[in-house]
């Protein structure tokens, strides 16, 4: 006997979270809980404003239609990426095919003061990996901050993300302020320039390795080994079903590329599932999941070690 619930939720964000020049005041999304006999599975559907093609209202409509079809015996996944991902997670939990083991190590995210990151990394055991958003300020400032961090922590490897913010000139201005002796400790820089060709040129000219992120979701993208390209950053909420996520990871690994499972600012429930996906598909790579502290609460499932208050399922708005 099948049953299902759908919940709508909204979490207040910390002040200062900006996506594509828009301030994100709340994170809005949906949960689906599928039950069959004694088993149950959960999934999160939370399109990311400015990045997802769909709004959460559109996702809600598709999700409710899919749930009704599933209750009637149909299991075909929806095409909408955020819904496909959330539903496939719920089905995987229901079938016990999403392993419980999780990689809760997250590359800490530096959003502002580099001194805060230095203090956080001082207590980090093992491999020191952190992420810095660049492209939000002047390229020269970004270069100086990155250089400072690499100089201050000799065993640090940085992941940088420019979100295609730079022109070729700005990319060169950034690189000018990063000591060439430190550049090999930039694990990769995600999408430095507005076009892939400009990003490739940046990698050739600076010796700084790059990673594809937004490019993975463009219709003309193909997985190929290229000089200067070291990694792909996979955001499952923006990718689609678990099967599609696994296909992309396998395609990257076949070319010797690093695949990084990365957050689209999901709630704690979604983040714990991403940690399990990372442990399953990319066990040797620290995932990019350090986004929970951008929010003011956890929901339903706790992230280990987080002190944020937890909103239980009974407090959510039930749609079905």
Swiss-Prot record:
Active-site feature positions: 133, 235
A GO term, aspect molecular function: O-succinylbenzoate synthase activity
Pfam families recorded: MenC_N, MR_MLE_C
One GO term of the biological process aspect: menaquinone biosynthetic process
Pathways per UniProt: Quinol/quinone metabolism; 1,4-dihydroxy-2-naphthoate biosynthesis; 1,4-dihydroxy-2-naphthoate from chorismate: step 4/7; Quinol/quinone metabolism; menaquinone biosynthesis
UniProt-listed InterPro entries: Enolase-like_C_sf, Enolase-like_N, Enolase_C-like, Mandelate_racemase_C, OSB_synthase_MenC1, OSBS_N
Record's keyword terms, sorted: Lyase, Magnesium, Menaquinone biosynthesis, Metal-binding
EC number(s) per entry: 4.2.1.113
Domain of life: Bacteria
Reactions mediated catalytically: (1R,6R)-6-hydroxy-2-succinyl-cyclohexa-2,4-diene-1-carboxylate = 2-succinylbenzoate + H2O
Binding positions (Mg(2+)): 161, 190, 213
Cofactor: a divalent metal cation
Keyword match Transcription regulation: no
Family: Belongs to the mandelate racemase/muconate lactonizing enzyme family. MenC type 1 subfamily.
Record HAMAP family: MenC_1 (MF_00470)
Function: Converts 2-succinyl-6-hydroxy-2,4-cyclohexadiene-1-carboxylate (SHCHC) to 2-succinylbenzoate (OSB).
Name of this protein: o-succinylbenzoate synthase
Species in which this protein is naturally found: Escherichia coli O9:H4 (strain HS)
Gene: menC
């Amino acid at each position: 006997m099948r049953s299902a619930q759908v919940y709508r939720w909204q979490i207040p964000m910390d002040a200062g979270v900006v996506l594509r020049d828009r301030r994100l005041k709340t994170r809005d999304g949906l949960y689906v809980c599928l039950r069959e006999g004694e088993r149950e599975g959960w999934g999160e559907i939370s399109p990311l404003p400015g990045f997802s093609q769909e709004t959460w209202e559109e996702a809600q409509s598709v999700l409710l239609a899919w749930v009704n079809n599933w209750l009637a015996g149909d299991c075909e996944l929806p095409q909408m990426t955020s819904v496909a991902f959330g539903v496939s997670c719920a089905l995987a939990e229901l079938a016990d095919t999403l392993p419980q083991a999780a990689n809760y190590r997250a590359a800490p995210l530096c959003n502002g003061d580099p001194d805060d990151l230095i203090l956080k990394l001082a207590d980090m055991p093992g491999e020191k990996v952190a992420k810095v958003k660049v492209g939000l300020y002047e390229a020269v400032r970004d270069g100086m901050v990155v250089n400072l961090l690499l100089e201050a922590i000799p065993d640090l490897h940085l992941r940088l993300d420019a979100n295609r913010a730079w022109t070729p000139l700005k990319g060169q201005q950034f690189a000018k302020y990063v000591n060439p002796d430190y550049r090999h400790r930039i694990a990769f820089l995600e999408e430095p320039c507005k076009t892939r060709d400009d990003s490739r040129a940046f990698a050739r000219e600076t010796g700084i390795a790059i990673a594809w992120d937004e490019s993975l979701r463009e219709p003309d993208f193909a997985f190929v080994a290229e000089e200067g390209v070291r990694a792909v950053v996979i955001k499952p909420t923006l990718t689609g079903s678990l099967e599609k996520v696994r296909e992309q990871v396998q395609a990257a690994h076949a070319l010797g590329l690093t695949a990084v499972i990365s957050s689209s600012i999901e709630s704690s429930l979604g983040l714990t599932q991403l940690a399990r996906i990372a442990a399953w598909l990319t066990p040797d790579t620290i995932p990019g999941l350090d986004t929970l502290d951008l929010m003011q609460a956890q929901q339903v499932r706790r992230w280990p070690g987080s002190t944020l208050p937890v909103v239980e399922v009974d407090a959510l708005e039930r749609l079905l």
